[in-house]
């Protein structure tokens, strides 16, 4: 099963014994994703949500359709609940900022483990400083 899965990742063609643990920073890409991105960049790339011309309209529709696909995949109540970010770090910064602005109150506590990645510690540390007498535990 693993060998069949590895066949979908071109990197293993030249690196047969590679064990890759850096996925949080940059995930390996499957061949179908590489092909789709290459085709998009080559034949239909445009700014999404920025133009009324055909390329932009078409790509905007595909982008929004992907939001619906993800929504269905994770059984979300609405595609509007799906937000794309460029990284997990950007995502956790967005979540911590939105929660601190809209849901947290002075004195609230944020609980974290000692195993958190630095990119998850800093946003919550900033939240605790922003809210008077809040604690990061």
Which ranges hold each PLM region?
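Pyridoxal 5′-phosphate
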Residues: 1-137
């Amino acid at each position: 099963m693993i060998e069949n899965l590895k066949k979908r990742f071109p990197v293993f063609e030249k690196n047969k014994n590679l064990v890759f643990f850096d996925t949080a920073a940059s995930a390996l890409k499957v061949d179908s994703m590489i092909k789709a991105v290459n085709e998009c960049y080559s034949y239909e790339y445009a700014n999404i949500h920025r133009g009324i011309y055909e390329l932009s309209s078409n790509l905007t529709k595909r982008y929004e359709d992907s939001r619906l696909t993800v929504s269905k995949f994770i059984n979300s109540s609405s595609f509007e609940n799906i937000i794309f970010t460029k990284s997990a770090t950007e995502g956790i910064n967005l979540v911590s900022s939105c929660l601190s602005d809209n849901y947290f109150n002075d004195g609230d506590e944020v609980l974290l483990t000692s195993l958190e990645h630095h990119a998850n510690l800093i946003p919550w540390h900033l939240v605790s400083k922003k809210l008077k007498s809040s604690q990061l535990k």
